[in-house]
């Protein structure tokens, strides 16, 4: 705890990264052993996000190295770029990793969802996107993840969630009365790569026993429910080789500990909750998380969120019980194809779960239909 407190620098703190000086404006977010600051280049006042990681253990050093390596390995329009980085000795036994990243003023997808719930109520049935826009946005996220899965060896992101997707060029329709003051200027979470959005006060599990969403009014074809933005994937400290063979209890417990520290329960695949001593884990853990993400984009909550007063372990019980049905009501009549895509991604049986290339193919088919 002490090291984290010492990392919370004042607003006039100056960092030197490879000879360039940056001054802290404010903190954007924090999580684990890192803080993210809004900084400006002293030479031209350009704004950036600076992620500072204080590493006191070999494990945290390895996490920082993995994140830097992922930034340097992948080049895709929907994957965040690393502008610069430096490493310094914070103290005798502690290294400080500094990652200079683009600053996205529109915040994260989670900010957008939270804003929607703030305006319309936490149980709102008003979606952020109509179906086509939702799938177009989601397709770009899938294509970014596909870069990881196509790597040799295949890699898994392992922490796909709305808080790890920042928004570029966010556009809200001009006739939306609510697009000003609440317009994601809670960007305090901008590049808060590893912020634990698992507690995102979203704690309403919308699995009402209402009829399928298709029995709702389709009055939301109105323009005010449609937004546009470019998703940018971030937070690569959780990236690991996707295909892991678990051969004994020691392997299982080691992986269990790792995923509990580096993944978000609401988006965690069922095979990662109670890992058997003889099993194979692969990149379809990301497909599960993506299915939960698509559900959240459509229905404003992860399908597996729990309330504050629910006991520990409730998330695991919900996940292991499978996707709640029927789907909650919505002001948008999402098609049966759309909902079936979610069902096929959030499949308890990983061997029956879609692969990402199949997901992308299905998305394109639905968009074109």
UniProtKB/Swiss-Prot annotation:
Keywords: ATP-binding, Kinase, Nucleotide-binding, Serine/threonine-protein kinase, Transferase. Gene3D superfamilies: Transferase(Phosphotransferase) domain 1. It comes from the Eukaryota. The active site is at residue 159. Pfam families: Pkinase. Its EC number is 2.7.11.1. Residues 22-367 form the Protein kinase domain. InterPro entries: Kinase-like_dom_sf, Prot_kinase_dom, Protein_kinase_ATP_BS, Ser/Thr-specific_kinases, Ser/Thr_kinase_AS. GO terms for cellular component: cytoplasm; Golgi apparatus. It is an enzyme of class 2 (transferase). This is Probable serine/threonine-protein kinase DDB_G0291350. It comes from Dictyostelium discoideum (Social amoeba). The lineage of its organism: Eukaryota, Amoebozoa, Evosea, Eumycetozoa, Dictyostelia.
